[in-house]
């Protein structure tokens, strides 16, 4: 999984910046509390994150009008087809395991039917079937983020799945008096970009083409040690 370094530049009056910091940074520990900014929906938080694909496939098998009776009411064919396509597309886009969703699971476990249905409901409502996937999509990882470097009105922190674009966008919305510049890069320059927020609104964004000159330039700024290592390797 990619390590993505995120950097925030905060501009505004010192009282407004301190208010923002106090609202999201855990006292005595340099950690951004993402849950204070963009909390996990309660419906997702109450669902176990494990075995989502299996549970969903068991439920789809039970309600598939083309399978045997599993003591659960069958869905109309058009509704079943819609849900099946939704789930296949989700897993294809997110982890490439769309082939694991069959709608004809060999031995569907009745104990998974309820969770499978709830997970599909959450996928339709929130774009994710469980809290783990939701956190990856919205926070950039499963947990809060440690701030590994702090300068004057500048933070650097790491996420492990995606850049924390949505959570920082929400932070800007909650603190319109603070101008926020957010940039991020993965090592090697594959995932690189930036967003600028003023008055709580996104006013500029950039998504660099993977491995492009702009991407490598920003990657070197956020991973200065990688550039230093490269230069040392080139020395005679």
Label every model-predicted segment.
Residues 1-236:
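Intrinsic low-complexity, intrinsically disordered or marginally ordered coil/linker segments
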């Amino acid at each position: 999984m990619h390590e993505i370094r995120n950097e925030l530049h905060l501009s505004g009056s010192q009282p407004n910046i301190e208010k923002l910091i106090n609202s999201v940074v855990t006292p005595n520990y340099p950690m951004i509390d993402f849950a204070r900014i963009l909390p996990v929906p309660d419906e997702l938080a109450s669902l176990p994150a494990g075995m989502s694909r299996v549970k969903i496939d068991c439920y789809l098998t039970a309600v598939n009008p083309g399978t045997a009776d599993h003591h659960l009411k069958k869905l109309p064919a058009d509704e079943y087809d819609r849900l099946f396509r939704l789930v296949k597309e989700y897993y294809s886009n997110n982890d490439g395991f769309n082939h694991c969703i069959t709608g004809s699971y060999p031995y569907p476990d009745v104990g998974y039917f309820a969770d499978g249905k709830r997970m599909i409901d959450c996928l339709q409502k929130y774009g994710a079937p469980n809290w783990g996937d939701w956190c990856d999509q919205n926070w950039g990882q499963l947990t809060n983020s440690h701030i590994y470097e702090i300068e004057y009105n500048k933070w650097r922190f790491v996420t492990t799945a995606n850049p924390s674009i949505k959570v920082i966008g929400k932070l800007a919305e909650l603190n319109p008096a603070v101008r926020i510049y957010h940039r991020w890069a993965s090592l090697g320059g594959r995932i690189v970009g930036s967003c600028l927020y003023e008055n709580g609104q996104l006013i500029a964004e950039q998504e660099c083409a993977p491995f492009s000159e702009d991407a490598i330039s920003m990657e070197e700024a956020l991973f200065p040690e990688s550039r230093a290592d490269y230069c040392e390797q080139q020395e005679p």
